[in-house]
Every structure is written in structure tokens, then in C-alpha cells.
Amino acid sequence: MGTQGRICPNALCKAVFLPLFESAAQNFLKTRRSVRRYKQEPLSKEVLTRIFDTVKMAPTACNDQPVRWIVSRDAQKTKQIVNLILCWMREEIFKDPTSQPALLGAHMIAKAKEGTDGLLRGAPNAAIAVVPKSHRWPEDGTIALTYLELAAHSMGVGACWGGFLTMAVRNFAGLREFLEIAEDEHVCGAQMLGYPEIKPTRQFPPREDVNITWL
């Protein structure tokens, strides 16, 4: 049960909210990009702390705040994570070379031999969100990951959802052990983090009209 109050924390009743103009908010949200090329400079602990100081404000069911984060603070640790993902992929190839993880793994292993990181895209930092398996709403972790991506964007830090990392940490005991994720914890997802190597364009990407069923 959350310690901050389930209905209306006293501090919230006294808070002063600054107005955020609609145009500024829309511009911020629409200019978010998935970053897949990073500078090698890792994010400082100060920058990471500032990002997660915003992330902690993500809403959770009953204000339980169940999300725990595992964050690699330097490129060396992140490279160890990449190597462990490759180990998992080799295991998948050995077990069933026709499975989807094996087919994807063969391609990523070949890229790694060429010196290309196709798994975490050379990002110097990574973050994994976990919640207790006993928590009824693992979606809280996904919401927190979305806050992470947006908080990073607000500070000029690039982020991208780490699908390969998420798959590996959910299925490979060796990686879970390295990340100190317990058996009673559910992995909600992961993201790569770092300063963009190329400044993203400020133009809005094309999107299809939103699919809405009006009742």
C-alpha cells in the first residue's frame, strides 16, 4: 500500500500548479523521437537523478508506487548487458534455430561480429522497470517507462524502447541474475538512454488518423 495517500495527499491540496500552454505541450509531445544513434558519453548521475525525479510522479494504481528501476550508469556495464543478450540468443539458436528469437539472434550476432550493436544501438545507459509479481497492475511499469521517455526528452536526452533487452531479461536467468532481478519480480520493459548523436528534426512525423469508436 502506498505511503503517500490513496485519495488526495495533503501536499497536493496545497500545491501551486503552473499553467502549461496547450501549444507548448503539444509541441513537446509531438517532437518526441525514438533515438537509435547515441554519443558515447554516458549520462551523469546528476542527470539521471533529475530524470527519475520526474519519473517518480508517474501515476500508479492506488498510489502504490511499486516500480523498481535497474539503471546502468556507465557504458561498460551496458556492454555487459549487450553481451548477455547475445548469450541468450546463442542459447535460443541452439535450442531451436527456427524460433523467432533464434532468427533475430542470428542477425544480431552477425552484426556484433562486425562491431555493430544492433541490440541497444550503442546507448551508454539503459533502464529496466520491474514490479512485484504480486502487484495487480503491471501496467504501472509501462506508464512509468513512458514518463521516463518524456522526462528524458525534456532534458535533451534520447531514449528508445528496448525490445531485445526486455525479451532477454524476461527469458534468460543469467541476465536476470546480473541485473539482480528476483524471481518474484515482473519485468515491465526497458529503454536505452543517452545523448543523441544526431539532433532529431523538429518536424512532426506523419501519423494516421486516430482510430476512435464514438459511443
Residue ranges and their predicted role:
Residues M1-C8:
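Iron-sulfur cluster-binding cysteine motifs and their immediate structural context
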Residues M89-A102, E177-Q203:
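A glycine-rich helix N-cap at a beta->alpha junction
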Residues C13-P19, A110-E114, H186-L215:
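C-terminal helix-cap and adjacent tail motif
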Residues D64-R73, F164:
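Short loop-to-beta-strand entry elements in the cores of soluble alpha/beta enzymes
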Residues N10, K14-T49:
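Extended interfacial segments that mediate partner engagement and assembly in macromolecular machines
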Residues R50-V55, N125-A127, V131-E177, Q191:
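Small-aliphatic-rich amphipathic alpha-helix that forms the alpha element of a beta-alpha
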Residues P66-V67, A123-A126, V187-C188:
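Short, surface-exposed beta-edge/turn micro-motifs
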Residues V71-G141:
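Glycine/small-residue-rich phosphate/adenosyl-binding loop
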